[in-house]
A protein has these predicted regions:
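N-terminal secretory/targeting leader peptides
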Residues: 1-202
Length: 202
């Protein structure tokens, strides 16, 4: 449909919220004013009483420093730590509960079809290695960040299973809306729900 071929994908790992106030459970995000990406996530948090504000990455540091926002959905714990976001904001969610983004590499199909078999094989092998490397690297960096942040006095909130289920159930409403956007979206969401139910996390 779009003339693109998927080469491969990888999961960078769970993201962690940055916060200037305690967020130990789902009830605590009521009126939580934070930076959020547009779309589905903003819908879910709004349904739970939070006040997501859509803003660019570049605006987040100043917004946090000036108190314009209470917190931010920015990136992984390690990336947030490396950016210095916990020097002033002493609370975070970890392990994350709300987002596990997936990145991918796609190629123009016409260009892909012109490649020789060994060239395609090399790219497919490289992207698989890249994916495994990124995932393990993020896990290691997050573990290092946990130690450093704990030493800094940052509180890491690990939501209970009950609170995680409350959040996921709230997400179902947004998912139903997004299913209407396209047959592909509906199929993807149903696959996701089936996986979560099979693994006892929904």
């Amino acid at each position: 449909k779009y003339g693109m071929t998927l080469i491969g994908w990888w999961i960078p790992g769970h993201e962690s919220l940055i916060s200037s106030k305690p967020i130990p459970d789902v009830a605590s995000i009521k009126d939580f004013k934070f930076r959020s990406p547009p779309g589905m996530e903003s819908m879910i948090f709004t349904a739970l009483g939070a006040k997501p504000i859509v803003m660019d990455f570049g605006e987040v540091p100043t917004a946090l420093q000036t108190g314009l926002i209470d917190g931010a959905d920015y990136s992984s714990l390690a990336t947030n730590y490396a950016g210095g976001h916990y020097e002033q904001n002493k609370y975070a969610t970890y392990p994350g509960f709300h987002s596990m983004p997936a990145d991918h590499l796609a190629c123009n199909t016409k260009v892909w079809n012109k490649l020789k078999p060994h060239e395609k094989g090399a790219m497919l092998a490289a992207i698989e290695i890249c994916g495994r490397t990124i995932t393990s690297l993020v896990e290691r960096k997050n573990a290092e960040a946990v130690k450093a942040l704990t030493a800094m006095g940052v509180t890491l909130h690990d939501w209970s299973r009950e609170d995680r289920l409350k959040f996921r159930n709230a997400a179902l409403g947004a998912w139903e809306e997004w299913k209407k956007k396209s047959p592909e979206a509906a199929a993807l969401i149903e696959i996701h729900k089936a996986y979560m139910k099979a693994n006892g996390i929904l």
